[in-house]
Amino acid sequence: MTRKSRARILTAASIALLTSSADLIAQAPAKPPLPDAPIARLIAQSAIQSDTQPVIPAPSAVTGQSPAALASTQPSTSNPRLTRAEAEAMATKKNPRVTVARLLALAQHQVVRETRAAELPTGLASITAVDADNATRISAGSLTSSRLFEHAGAGGGFTQLITDFGRTRNLVASSKLQEKAQNANALATTEDIVIATDQAFYNALQAQALLKVSQQNVDTRQTTDTQVNEMTKNKLKSTLDSSFADVNLSQAKLLLLDAQNNADSTMAALDAVLGLDRQVTYELVDDNAPLQPPPPDVDNLVQTGLQQRPDLQALHYDQQAAVKFSHAQHDQLFPTISAAGTAGSVPIRPAEYYVANWWGAIGVNMNIPVFNGFLYTSQAKEASIRAEAASEQSRNLRDQIVRDIRTSWLAANTAYQRVAVTAELLKQANLALGLAQTRYQLGLSSIVELSQAQFQQTDAAIGNTNAQYQYRLALATLNYQIGATP
């Protein structure tokens, strides 16, 4: 075999080896992406396609906009519009937890009236008619007057507590404090529903925005896939480029499914907070207000929270009510003095047994506790211990409020700083994507580099959008922690 023949064989073998390697790479399955949020892998919207040379889509102006601008890029649908303020008002009106808390407060007011009834006189009236054999006697049963007479009469009586040395007064005071505690709990429940509504609203708003981005991502990847496949047919790009474009399109479709499921789930959560028993899909409207930095002084926020938090006020009232009830239990050891009276008329009566046709009497009674197996002393001790426990519960919640306000303030500051950082990151990602597109169009880089730049740009755009929502939610959480009235 001549040297020239050997050179031809080696050249042909090298070309065959390179061709088979390229085909193997193109046919190899794409490496599965690392588990991450779907929003981290969304792709930007494509630009207008050129007539002569296929152009890779430019960075989407939509994904780099604010959440409100992103929502406004889509045509309005027939779904009802809903703002955050409207959602809060609807939730506080229709959510069953708020209704239950208000009803319990109304019920506690009736407990106050029930307790106060012991201080008021009790009156009753009676009408009695008896048909009996005169002078016969009851010989079995309870210990009562044994003689029976035919008679008919009507009368009335009353009882009035004179004093029980403060027991009833302390019971009334305790029930009034419990009513205040229940009203504070109702307000705390309302604030819980408001913050839950804000969380559900922003989650659903974010999910709707990401659903629109994912749909644009599918359109972009479809355009890119069509362009690259056409260039591959014309021998302008390799099979590897076409394979990467197909993989990116499949990933975009999967992300669209995830985004749709996330949007439906968050909307279902919002419907539940709003107190709806059916599915209603709203078109959520952001307030589009400029972002303001959080308050600079956390100590003032702590003092405000300790003064305004309704759940802390409820525990204070509960502790005071427990103290009053403890005093009332101690007062059981004192005597109880009450008055009683009765009067009436007997128009039908046997004259030989009745000296008058009416009766009347009034008197005063004193009950003095002597011994009942240490019941009163044990009840008094139990009430004192429970009052101390209520005081410690109030102190524990106070410490938690101080901690929660400080951590919420730190989270709000961090979220506010992330808005500026993610905006700068988005700016740099847009610049990097533009350079990567230019290099790919000039044939200086592969589609892998372009895809990586597109991923980074989309990740930065979604991160900037998320940062704005997270800061709004962080401010709402901070207002909740300081007890701001919704």
Language-model region placement:
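A glycine-/polar-enriched beta->alpha junction
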Residues: 89-99, 106-122, 156-174, 184-191, ...
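Small/polar, glycine/serine/threonine/aspartate-rich low-complexity segments that form flexible
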Residues: 70-80, 126-160, 284-298, 327, ...
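Periplasmic alpha-helical coiled-coil/stalk elements that build and connect Gram-negative outer-membrane
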Residues: 189-304, 411, 415, 456-457, ...
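Bacterial Sec-pathway N-terminal export signals of envelope proteins
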Residues: 26-128, 278, 285-319, 370, ...
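Acidic, low-complexity, intrinsically disordered peripheral segments
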Residues: 2-12, 19, 24-51, 133, ...
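Transmembrane beta-barrel architecture of outer-membrane proteins
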Residues: 151-153, 199, 244, 359-361, ...
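Short segments within alpha-helical structural elements
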Residues: 117, 251-276, 415, 424-484
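Alpha-helical heptad-repeat coiled-coil segments that mediate oligomerization/polymerization in large
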Residues: 238, 401, 408, 443-446
